[in-house]
Amino acid sequence: MLSGFLAVALSTSACVTSAQVPLEEYTLARAAYEAAKDADAIRYAPSLWYTAEENYREAQRAFKERRYGRAGDLFEDAREAAEKAENAARIARHQAGDS
């Protein structure tokens, strides 16, 4: 999935300046999303996880539709929600003795 998005981004960057394509936002959101997933946020912080997942999927759709400004904003929102979900999950796991 990651390589597919990067291929699309690289192929479209020839048509659009690289400043408009939110590659950094995508990369940071993806890393935060994976970290939250690894922290078992879906179990320990489901509402935050759901927000991160929804923002991430909507950002992917916007990116595919070349709405790069919207995609960048949504990737940032997804990253923030995923980071909160990861932190909340780690705290909840620790409190539950599952760490």
Task: Annotate each language-model stretch with its function.
Residues Y33, W49, Y56, F63, ...:
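Inward-facing hydrophobic residues that define packing positions of alpha-helical scaffold repeats
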Residues M1-G4:
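Bacterial N-terminal signal peptides that target proteins for export
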Residues Y44, E58, Y68-R70:
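Amphipathic, hydrophobic secondary-structure cores in small proteins
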Residues D73, R79-A96:
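Short, charge-rich amphipathic alpha-helical segments embedded
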Residues T17-Y56, A96-S99:
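Amphipathic, heptad-repeat alpha-helical segments
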Residues E34-K37, A41, K64, E83-K84, ...:
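Helix-capping and short linker residues that terminate individual alpha-solenoid repeat units
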Residues S11-A14:
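C-terminal motif of bacterial Sec signal peptides marking the signal peptidase cleavage site
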